[in-house]
UniProtKB/Swiss-Prot annotation:
Topology of this chain in the membrane: Multi-pass membrane protein
Pfam families to which the protein is assigned, alphabetical: PSII (PF00421)
Listed HAMAP family: PSII_PsbC_CP43
BP GO terms, sorted: photosynthetic electron transport in photosystem II
A cellular-component GO term for this protein: plastid membrane
Family of the protein in this entry: Belongs to the PsbB/PsbC family. PsbC subfamily.
Subunit structure: PSII is composed of 1 copy each of membrane proteins PsbA, PsbB, PsbC, PsbD, PsbE, PsbF, PsbH, PsbI, PsbJ, PsbK, PsbL, PsbM, PsbT, PsbX, PsbY, PsbZ, Psb30/Ycf12, at least 3 peripheral proteins of the oxygen-evolving complex and a large number of cofactors. It forms dimeric complexes.
Gene3D superfamilies in UniProt: photosystem ii from thermosynechococcus elongatus
Origin species: Cuscuta reflexa (Southern Asian dodder)
Name of the protein this chain belongs to: Photosystem II CP43 reaction center protein
Single GO molecular function: chlorophyll binding
InterPro entries from the UniProt entry: PS_antenna-like (IPR000932), PS_II_antenna-like_sf (IPR036001), PSII_PsbC (IPR005869), PSII_PsbC_sf (IPR044900)
Transmembrane segments: 69-93, 134-155, 178-200, 255-275, 291-312, 447-471
């Protein structure tokens, strides 16, 4: 089997397990990659690579539509979303579809429509993917030069980057439009326990919006994850959408400067590594967001955050024991600190006991009971509303703890419900995906840099044991 020198020079060439098998006419002889290396065989075939990408998009959208309809079919309106293993309906509910005051689902039809629209879209994408993979032109450069490209063409690559940025900016503005004009979004902070509302007074002050980026990531500071009102959140999307669109126009109209041409490796595998690095950051950030933030991910749909469930337990027992006659302002716990209430390091009144570590939690069911110096003793004695008691008792028994075999809840809480919170699933999956994408970033960055430096040879195959073995077929 003769492998071209040019292919040996630029790609590592894998030893075939089965020399006779060639998928879609793409064999190792012509591409330098075996069938199991997937889309690497299409590096220089822009038309076929387009087919692979469109088909991949079709699979993603098909999963979204099918899973959406599956969740609608299994949905029980009487139970909270987070108790039903739902991971898609909470997102639709957060966007304000189908829900009313308190996050109660009043109409599942919008969820059905969403699923059907995704299925129809996936059919169109699937057809396009099959067409471009099997029937369309192998390369686009000759027939459709606008869609064609060469990986080393720096100007074309930044133009493609610009188009992607504009599409991301449009996506950010779609959320802004939904919040402003198309029915609003669900606000967990709305008075009385949350409701859908239109966001009128956007926060557009650059010092406020970009101040989040400059915050410490630790404790009550919480970097961008600490955003706790929708005016800031939607205003941030206005800024982000504007930056993406303006940046996209900039990259379309300009050519890379000399320093950028020198600093970057300009090859397909290098672009893959940059993309994986960016997605890794997105994954880790999303993990922190879904775990700690109950504004973008309302607890009514995703279940309480860990700190929220812990504080809810302290609150529930404060309410119970206060009714039984305990003086919650002065009762001492076993360590000599306050049993129900104590002071934080900075002097605020906070819940006592083990939940003291979560003293900087903010939650809509708890904030009305705070005064200028933390929890207000008078409000705790006279102003606690039934909805606050109900919600904290519910959250106390639904801590976002759990394992892969679905044994969830606090081990020591006898009333805990055995379930796994969507928060656990979303945070864990995004951490794991972010981690593996980071490893992929390192792997492909190393290979791309080696190829650019000219020492990408791969393993010497001449004396490899597998070459003397009988072929599998």
């Amino acid at each position: 089997m003769k492998t071209l020198y040019s292919l040996r020079r630029f790609y590592h060439v894998e030893t075939l397990f089965n020399g006779t098998l060639a998928l879609a006419g793409r064999d190792q002889e012509t591409t330098g990659f075996a069938w199991w290396a997937g889309n690497a065989r299409l590096i220089n075939l822009s038309g076929k690579l387009l087919g692979a990408h469109v088909a991949h998009a079709g699979l993603i959208v098909f999963w979204a539509g099918a899973m959406n309809l599956f969740e609608v079919a299994h949905f029980v309106p009487e139970k909270p979303m987070y108790e039903q293993g739902l991971i898609l309906l909470p997102h639709l509910a957060t966007l304000g579809w189908g829900v009313g005051p308190g996050g109660e689902v009043i109409d599942t039809f919008p969820y059905f429509v969403s699923g059907v629209l995704h299925l129809i879209s996936s059919a169109v994408l699937g057809f396009g993917g099959i067409y471009h993979a099997l029937l369309g032109p192998e390369t686009l450069e000759e027939s459709f030069p606008f869609f064609g490209y060469v990986w080393k063409d720096r100007n074309k690559m930044t133009t493609i980057l610009g188009i992607h940025l504009i599409l991301l900016g449009i996506g950010a503005f779609l959320l802004v439009l939904k919040a402003l004009d198309f029915g609003g979004v669900y606000d967990t902070w709305a008075p009385g326990g949350g409701d859908v509302r239109k966001i009128a007074n956007l926060t557009l002050s650059p010092s406020l919006i970009f101040g989040y980026l400059l915050k410490s990531p630790f404790g009550g500071e919480g970097w961008i994850v600490s955003v706790d009102d929708l005016e800031d959140l939607i205003g941030g999307h206005v800024w982000l959408g504007s930056i993406c669109i303006l940046g996209g126009i900039w990259h379309i109209l300009t050519k890379p400067f000399a320093w950028a041409r020198r600093a970057f490796v300009w090859s397909g595998e290098a672009y893959l590594s940059y993309s994986l690095g960016a997605l890794s950051i997105f994954g880790f950030t999303a993990c922190c967001f879904v775990w700690f933030n109950n504004t973008a991910y309302p607890s009514e749909f995703y279940g309480p955050t860990g700190p929220e469930a812990s504080q809810a337990q302290a609150f529930t027992f404060l309410v119970r024991d206060q009714r039984l006659g305990a003086n919650v302002g002065s009762a001492q716990g076993p360590t000599g600190l306050g049993k129900y209430l104590m002071r934080s390091p900075t002097g605020e009144v906070i819940f006592g006991g083990e939940t003291m570590r979560f003293w900087d939690l903010r939650a809509p069911w708890l904030e009305p009971l705070r005064g200028p110096n933390g929890l207000d003793l008078n409000r705790l004695k006279k102003d606690i509303q039934p909805w606050q008691e109900r919600r904290s008792a519910e959250y106390m028994t639904h801590a976002p703890l759990g394992s892969l075999n679905s044994v969830g809840g606090v081990a020591t809480e006898i009333n805990a419900v055995n379930y796994v919170s969507p928060r656990s699933w979303l945070a864990t999956s995004h951490f794991v995906l972010g981690f593996f994408f980071f490893i992929g970033h390192l792997w492909h960055a190393g290979r791309a840099r080696a190829a650019a430096a000219g020492f990408e040879k791969g393993i010497d195959r001449d004396f490899e044991p597998v070459l003397s073995m009988t072929p599998l077929n």
